[in-house]
A protein has these predicted regions:
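Glycan-recognition and catalytic cores of secretory/periplasmic carbohydrate-active enzymes
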Residues: 1-289
Length: 289
C-alpha cells in the first residue's frame, strides 16, 4: 500500500528468540546483532512514556523515517491493545534471558508494572481486549493475552532482584493461571472445538472475538509448565545453544543457515519483495506477488 513501506509490529518481539538461537547454533553474530537492533529500535519507537506500546510503526523502507504509529488491532491508535502489551513483555523478558543486557530487563519490568497496576485490569486478571476500550458487560476479554503475560511473568520473576517485586509478578501470574483454569475460560473436554480455552480476541476491529485461539492454548500450557518447573526448583526455561549430539546436527544447522540467511538478509535490507518474490493465496492484493 502507498506510504506503508516497512510495517513493524510489536508482536515481532517474541520472534527474536529465533535469531538469538540461530547465532548460538551457527556461531554467526549477525543474527544476534539483528535481534538487538530490532529490540533497541522497538524500545525507541514503539513505546510511550507510560510503557504502553503502539501496535504498528510504519517506516519509510528507504530512509527509515517514521511515517505513522498505529494500533490496527486495538481500540484506537493511542490505546493499549492488550496482546501487544503481552507480546512486548514476553519478548523483552526473553531478550534479557538470551543476552543478559540490563536494558531489556528494565524494559520488561516497566511493561510488567504498567500492566500489573493498570486500573482497567479486571479482578480475575484476564484483560479486556484493549486496556483503553470502553467497558460494558459485553466488552470482550482476551484470554490469550493473559496466557502470554503469565508465561512471561513467571520467567521475569526469576530475574528480578527485588524480592517484593518478584513476588508481585509471580502472584499476578498465579492469579491469571487460576482464572484461566476454571469457568468461564477453561472449556470442558470435547467442547469448544477441542480447544482448551475460551474467550480470546484475535482481532476485534475485524470482528474476530470471543473465540478460541491456538496460541492461547500454547502459552497457557507453556505457563503451566514453567510454573511447575519453578515449584520444583528448576530453571523455568532451558537455555540451549546446541541442538544435540546427533550425527546429523551439522546438516540441520547448515540447511537452516542456507534457508534463513537470504531471507533475513533481504528482509533487513528491505529487498525481500524484489529479490525473493512469493506466491500468496491472500485476497489482499498487497500480499500477492
Amino acid at each position: 500500500r502507498k506510504n506503508r513501506d516497512f510495517i513493524v509490529i510489536v508482536d515481532n518481539m517474541m520472534n527474536l528468540e529465533l535469531l538469538t538461537v540461530t547465532s548460538a547454533l551457527t556461531a554467526d553474530p549477525q543474527y544476534l546483532d539483528m535481534a538487538r537492533t530490532h529490540a533497541n529500535t522497538t524500545i525507541r519507537n514503539h513505546y510511550r512514556p507510560d510503557y504502553s506500546s503502539w501496535h504498528v510503526v510504519n517506516y519509510n523502507g528507504e530512509t527509515g523515517e517514521i511515517i505513522s504509529k498505529e494500533t490496527e488491532q486495538g481500540h484506537a491508535d493511542g490505546s493499549a491493545w492488550s496482546r501487544g502489551q503481552a507480546w512486548g513483555l514476553y519478548g523483552f523478558t526473553m531478550m534479557y534471558r538470551q543476552t543478559r543486557d540490563a536494558r531489556y530487563l528494565e524494559q520488561a519490568v516497566h511493561i510488567a508494572e504498567f500492566l500489573m497496576d493498570h486500573p482497567a485490569l479486571p479482578k480475575d486478571k484476564i484483560p479486556y481486549w484493549d486496556l483503553d476500550a470502553p467497558v460494558t458487560k459485553d466488552t470482550p476479554r482476551d484470554a490469550s493475552s493473559a496466557c502470554i503475560m503469565a508465561s512471561a511473568l513467571i520467567e521475569l520473576s526469576t530475574f528480578v532482584q527485588d524480592p517484593v517485586l518478584s513476588q508481585r509478578f509471580l502472584t499476578l501470574a498465579e492469579q491469571q493461571l487460576t482464572s484461566l483454569s476454571k469457568a468461564p475460560y477453561r472449556a470442558k473436554a470435547g467442547e469448544n472445538a477441542n480447544f482448551i480455552l475460551k474467550h480470546s480476541t484475535a482481532n476485534k476491529p475485524a470482528g474476530t472475538f470471543d473465540t478460541p485461539l491456538v496460541y492461547a492454548d500454547y502459552y497457557y500450557i507453556e505457563a503451566l509448565l514453567r510454573y511447575k518447573r519453578l515449584l520444583e526448583g528448576r530453571p523455568v526455561v532451558d537455555v540451549r545453544t546446541v541442538v544435540s549430539d546427533h550425527p546429523d546436527r551439522e546438516l540441520w544447522i547448515s540447511t537452516l543457515d542456507r534457508i534463513a540467511r537470504p531471507v533475513v538478509a533481504n528482509l533487513a535490507a528491505g529487498t525481500l519483495k524484489k529479490n525473493l518474490p512469493f506466491e500468496s493465496l491472500s485476497a489482499d492484493p498487497d500480499r500477492r506477488e
